[in-house]
Amino acid sequence: MSHPLPPNIQEILQLLPHRYPFLLVDRVIEFNAGKYIKAYKNVSINEPFFQGHFPGFPVMPGVLILEAMAQSGGITVLQSFPINELQGKVFLFAGIENVKFRQQVIPGDQLILECEIIRHKLQLWKMSCQAFVNNKLVAEAILTAAMTNKENF
């Protein structure tokens, strides 16, 4: 199913089960459903994780950068299905490869998330993902995700 416009926040909330404080995609900038997405997360000092990571030296945890990339990739995969086909389904991490963190992400940054689907077989998707701040690469990874029935979860 082709979607000519990037999903708005209401559509993102329909696609992803995540909610505050764990929804890590604020807006989709560009996308081609099932192929590519560019989105962003505005990183605010009000994020709950900054209370403990780290007091006096707030740094976004790397695992949350990975999660933001995964949520972005999930949006592009899930947008390729009619919404009624997603009932009873869940989209999960299945693997992470070649993770590199290159720079810290701090309050005030806008984290740009880019994911490209590089392989799809049956219910598995492999994505090449990068995160940028001010056009500088801050993290990259190859992510694998799987779609399964919620009752199998």
Curated annotation (Swiss-Prot):
Q: Which Pfam families match?
A: FabA
Taxonomic lineage is: Bacteria, Pseudomonadati, Thermodesulfobacteriota, Desulfovibrionia, Desulfovibrionales
One cellular component term (GO) for this entry is:
membrane
This molecule's function is given as: Involved in unsaturated fatty acids biosynthesis. Catalyzes the dehydration of short chain beta-hydroxyacyl-ACPs and long chain saturated and unsaturated beta-hydroxyacyl-ACPs.
Query: Might you name a Gene Ontology BP term for this protein?
Result: fatty acid biosynthetic process
Q: Which family does it belong to?
A: Belongs to the thioester dehydratase family. FabZ subfamily.
**Where does the record say this protein resides?**
Cytoplasm
Q: What is its EC number?
A: 4.2.1.59
What name has this protein been given in UniProt? Answer: 3-hydroxyacyl-[acyl-carrier-protein] dehydratase FabZ
Q: Name one GO molecular function term.
A: (3R)-hydroxyacyl-[acyl-carrier-protein] dehydratase activity
Q: Which UniProt keywords apply?
A: Cytoplasm, Lipid A biosynthesis, Lipid biosynthesis, Lipid metabolism, Lyase
Q: Where is the active site?
A: H53
Organism of origin is Lawsonia intracellularis (strain PHE/MN1-00)
Chief localisation class: cytoplasm
Reaction(s) catalysed by this chain, per the record, are:
a (3R)-hydroxyacyl-[ACP] = a (2E)-enoyl-[ACP] + H2O
**Which NCBIfam families does the entry link to?**
fabZ (TIGR01750), PRK00006.1 (NF000582)
Query: Zinc: present as a keyword of the record?
Result: no
